[in-house]
Amino acid sequence: MRAGIALGSNLGERSAILSDAIGHLREIHEHGDFLLSSLHETEPMDCPPGSPLFLNGVVELETSLSPLELLHKFQTLEIAAGRPRNHGANEPRYLDLDLLYCDGMTLNLPELELPHPRITGRLFVLAPMAEIRPDLRLPGWERSCREYLSIIHNKQNYQIAH
């Protein structure tokens, strides 16, 4: 199954942390193309005032792991990178891994929704995702990733930080 994963970090040595996470994702990858966007340095969204800038990217890989197995693997990697178990939403973090989609699968569980319900409202996910899969249309989407990116880019005051 093809799985899309968002990566983010805004604490510590962000590039090194994401590089390490990408290495672990390559271990999960089984065959075919391993797609990796560039890393975008972005302003934090909905985080406490004064939160550091994020580095964000998106990976797509092939795996035989189930979505829940991927979720548990991601949680293990986040904890190993220094994320507390009781970490609140939208707080600064060393590593954040979000499962965005798995092929054309839909899932609605308390711990996991697929496709991720907030992709189309997050430019920091759509921009790197459009680099690797611009024409992707996920279940429930009326437009492609590139089209959603164009729409949201015009509505949000969002810039890639320099």
Provide a role label for each language-model segment.
Residues M1-A3, A21-E27, L35, E62-L68, ...:
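Generic detector of short, locally flexible boundary/turn motifs and exposed helical patches
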Residues M1-H31, L36-E43:
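N-terminal beta1-alpha1 ligand-phosphate binding loop
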Residues L7-S9, T63, A130:
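Short, structured patches in soluble enzyme cores that scaffold and shape functional sites
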Residues L39, M45-F54, L65-H162:
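Flexible, gly/pro- and Lys/Arg-enriched active-site loops
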